[in-house]
Amino acid sequence: MEKIKILFIISNLQKENTEYKKTIDLFFKHFNDDVIELNYIVDPKREQLETLLNLNNYFCIMPCGLWSVKESHNDKVIIYKYNIIQTLQSQDIAFIGSDYIKSLIFNDRPAYLKMSGIAPEGKIISRYNYKKMHVDKILKNLFPANLTPLYSGNYISKVKYVANSYDDLMETASSIYLSDKDIDEIYIEKQIKDRIDISVIIIGNPPYLFDFTSILLHNGEVNINIDIPSDAKTSIIRTAYEFYYKFSFKDFAEFQFTYCKQSKQVYLTDINIHNILKKVIIEGLLQLYNMNFQQIIYLFLTVYINNKTEKGTIPLLRYLVKRLPNEIVDDLISFENKNLLYKKYNYKDICHELKKRILKPDESNRNELVRLISNTFKNLPVVQTPTSLYLGDENYSFLDDFKEIPLYPQEPQLILEKSSQILNGQMRWHVPSMLYNIDPSIMFSPIVASTFTNLYNPSAMSSIYCAGYIEMEKQIVSQLSSLIGWNAQKSSGVFTPGGKICLSYGIKAGINRCKRQYDSTTTPVVVCSEINHFSIEAVCYQLGLPKKNCIRVPLTPSGTIDFHKYEQILIDLFEKKIPIACIVFSGGNTTHCVVEDIFHGTQILKNTLRKWNIKYIPFVYYDLVVCWPWLFFKDYDYETNKLDIKQIVLDKIKFVTKTIEHCYLADGIGIDFHKCGFAPLTNSLFLTKNDEDLFFMTDVSVNKAKREPYHYTFCNSRGATDIISAWNILQSVGVEGFQGYIANMLTVANNFAALMPKFDFEVIDTLNTYGFSTILWASIPQKHHNIIECIENGNESIRLNDQYLFYLTEYLKKDVQQGIFVRYLPNYIEVSSRCRIAVIVLLPMTLNLNECNSYKIVEYIGKKKKEYDLEYQKNPNLSFDKMPDEVPK
């Protein structure tokens, strides 16, 4: 193996005692190794250093400071006007320790201590303002204080002063400023008495790190036995790691803390990111691991090499690790390098590697999660333009490299970066031109809340396993019950993975109520209107009811339930003694968002039950997954109109709110936070007016005081991220936040509806559309007829027009950088069993779209339609993707 050369750059600026310096000098002079040639230079001039670097091919440099001392005086030293780290970095010379930018930041001790938030109280006074300073609160709390002169030029103070009072400070400051014109400022720092000075040394590069602590005694000796409370020690170590990760320190750092015995407080007093020769580091390693100075050189070289990827360094790494304690090697060397070093491994090696990927017992490696996220973010697919419809380009070729599960553990950062490429081609819901579906822009807070929740993995099946999450769930239920108008003491609720599961709970509650209250062998039915969600038949089937037992009530021309036919269906069922398990009313959808009048519906039910002397009451479920945020307008003063909402928009809000404010009449309600609630999928909440309807879902025998979610939920494996996401949304957005959001999106929808006819679009039933959607229809350019005429012209006319609309939607999104993604809905109206008429839906959801930029969206659609019509007239058979037969409403 070829011998390598290492250069130490040493400075006499370091405050070590004379005996220790002699020890270091002796070591350098007598260092002898078959593989490493150790050179050192003390306080070089820049020319001297650069000449040495040019003449020698050093494997790496070990700088032990930022500056070289030019002259030393009693009270100050004069340094050369160059930064050692900057010089090395500018010439691309490899060195151990952190980079130049961090060196600059952490050379300004007052600044970074203040930034830390846990430093002793401090204040800077300047030559020009100190006489005008008053005895403010900060100054009062500082005494007794240490005073450190701060020079403007290339000087560093060697002395500190002490001030015991304000008058003492003024006198000392005057003396300092008079005695030396180069001193511009004085840093005043509260003196901590009865203290223990502790250094936490972290060595390595994440996640391959180890740490130890040393105490520098007042007599200059080092002790590794730290006599402070364990909670303080844990806090100190965790804080050190937090800074190590936060500032991405490289190779090592020493964090100096002071523990005040009297106040039991911990203070950060200094950070060393370059000098590996400090006594607390060398002596600490000697006492803890019985390492000599030569082994310490091996240690830092090992750290340096392990962070490199060149396989040519493996022989050198093998040489070094053989001479180091095994426990240090285990912590510092990656599994991949161990594999290259030893060509064999056992289960302990694997477990040691995997252990680095979970929290330590003291949780000092929490910030490893932040590092992984931060690095992965840098490798996400590229956002090509602000208006790009998709993230990156659709490309999943990386999956070809993972056809089989790897044999041994792989680098998690690499795998994360690979996996993030699966987002290529992902729709960007937050882009104003994304008008496809009811997917909101997700707020940051629920994502953060979900992340730290997942880190601790609470299981919300029981309060034993999930800290306070079930209490948080109960608080959300209580808040929303009050909003609905229920007695929060009697209501209950449970978070579910989606609105379909909420429907399942509602229908199951109805089936259970039927069994308890109605003696019949006839299979019960579920009644709902044609506007209700398409999944209800599937839910019935999954719960043991035939699909035909979902009875759909026809609609009125306004698109809501026909209450006359609804009443006739109830009468017919009661006449035939067919039990009704559940009646579902719609609380809005993704088309016209017509909400059904639950007040009228329950009055009809109540009267019919009385008339037919029915002794049980079917479970009434209000499917409010879309329009629940309109409840925040229940107490809005429409006359004052505090939020200055346009009247046409306000009228629609008022209509919906006045209809759904009777939701308290429902027995159960479903809410989706992932629709108009800013939360990631999936996040739904099923609520019941009376807790027994939920608690008797599966097991009626459980003692109420001992009841846990697993007694009444459909599944035992239950996370808690939906709970904390919803809680964060509710508490951070607030009533007026939801009001503002609804007003904004309805204003955009109103603009769309008002302006689209100018571009030969027909807006369908705008007067009976109350949500964010705008339903559009347009005629084939050669025909110039309206939707009614198209229907009257028969199936072929409808088919051709449907095809035209589909091609138009494809044309609008053809330019993925500037296009518009709208929704093609082929099954809007069923004309016959073999023919349905299609429409285009504009569904704005993001707050990045507002009244102003909505005009640009309309103009772009109009412009593109004009272009497309010209092309279509030339060639009606334009080539696009296959036209879908069905799109979920």
Role assignments for model-derived ranges:
Residues 229-327:
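ATP-dependent carboxylate activation and anion-phosphoryl transfer catalytic cores
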Residues 502, 508-691:
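Conserved PLP-enzyme active-site core in the AAT-like
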Residues 589, 641-769, 778-783, 847, ...:
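Active-site C-terminal subdomain of aminotransferase-like
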Residues 164-231, 261, 266-267, 668:
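Phosphate-binding site of ATP-dependent enzymes
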Residues 22, 26, 30, 34-133, ...:
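Conserved N-proximal alpha/beta basic substrate-recognition cap immediately N-terminal to
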Residues 763-816, 836, 843-844, 850:
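Conserved PLP-binding catalytic core of the aspartate aminotransferase-like
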Residues 2-10, 100-194:
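Active-site nucleotide/adenylate-binding loops and adjacent lid/helix of ATP-dependent enzymes
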